[in-house]
Amino acid sequence: MTRTAAPPATSCRRTRRCGAVLAGLTLALAAAAFDAPAAELFQSDGWDLRWDNTLRYTAAFRLFPYSNAVVADPNADDGDRNFAPGLISDRLDLLSEFDLSNGPFGIEASGAFWYDTVYHQANSNDSPATFNPYTVPHNRFTHATEILDGQDADLLNLFAYGSLDAGDIPVSFRVGRHTLLWGESLFFANNGIGAGQAPIDAIKAASEPEAEAKELFLPVDQVSLTVQPSPDLSFAFYDQFEWRRDRLPGSGSYFSDADYLDAGGERIIVSPGEYLYRTPDNRPPASGQFGAAMHLMLGEVDYGLYALQFHAKEPQILTYYSSSGGNNDGAYWLTFPSYIQAYGASFSTYAGESTLAGEISLRTNMPLVSQGLFALPGSGGGGYGGFAYAALRPPQVSPAPALQAVLAYPTGGTLHAQLSSVSTLSPGAFWQGADLSAEIATNDLLNVTGHPELLASGRDSFAAAFRAVFEPHYYEVLPALDLSLPVGLGYDLIGKSSVDASMNNGAGDIELGISATYRTVWQGSLTYTHFIGPPDRQPFSDRDFVSISVQRTF
């Protein structure tokens, strides 16, 4: 099944100016349109112009102070120390969407703007000695983090679309910035076939653990094409001409547990007074990312086959270290592995009121969890998301083009599988309707083909994780008011993955919430998130929080 993901807000400096113009225009007109429903601005002679806006306010509160066990690593403590119990987010979001169409052809554009007051003021950091940035005082956020988490605008979708007949064969296309999600991933965005097609909003994944994969993927510039020679057979293709990295939490932000990644990351603490300073990243080429898929409907089952090549969106860390002493002992930089291949198959079908789906995929040249050639104090040889430290000693501090071909992280073949179900439950004694979604995901390390000496010790070849969301609904509780009570559970069942360092058995999270919809355009929610697991497996084990949000669509 091919899904077009709903694009979440993300920072993108290259498109900030366009997003700012769009946000400014929307804010200027929002007051006049606020009492109107979703706007169909124009319709005449086949032309249809729509403009839809969603304005949301969110406040989130930390419940408990940091744990000394969690902040023991000086390179993973700033995000924890920066926030005392109390307000951790005071944020306004605006999403604006335009669609101009004429028959089967059209142009779609969307943009986002956000502002969070928390990142524009002093924080609660109480440890200057373990504060990684050097451009700001220990109780301030770096400028890059302030922008990413505190105030930004982004152009999301901007593409032309259309459909036509090539003879008797229907053909549809999209050209421009949009998102594709192939395969059948429900929750585990990074484990599925579609993981190679787009970067992931890791901030949203951490702050909303129950979010579905389609809500986490970010758009990129590409051309995509679907050809359907018969009602039961279709082929899909895409070619990307933009590479974007995952949107990792800014250094020192609430959901950051790596002080050296990504926006705002400035240095690694080796020992008191000794540092590795960040130098420019090694970015992969914009080209070389493409894929093809086939779907065949046999009876009630949709089968899919996939092949794609992509560049990694999450980084590995390379370092240059000198033991000569002094205050500038070396450097580190982020590198993004290139030319990873994936081959997969999927199925989806219906069983009564439920959808059952699954997929399996093989990746080659896949970067693995790195052990590193040296361990920093308190790190145990690990790092944020498993982006451990692989030491490399180049002839100069700044990475030269010739060094990009040097493998300083382990790679290998991996096998990934996922099975999911989405069910609509009939009215019962305790609800008027309910939805139940669940997925299990596994990954298996088949072989190590590059730098096996760098593979992290203590990791397992096989790992499995589970996530489920149950949401009962109650209609017309008051006139025009509907309520639901979502409950989510995520838990890593087996193994410490050698493929995904965030998959550690015994770690997980629980979400308890209540959400309301009034007159279909007002929505509100209250959610409590509790993180499960010890600090060595769950870096957010002391960061339980409550969030409140209200939004209006107009």
Question: Where are the language model's segments positioned?
Answer:
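Short loop/turn motifs that connect adjacent beta-strands in outer-membrane beta-barrel proteins
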Residues: 37-51, 64-66, 98-107, 120, ...
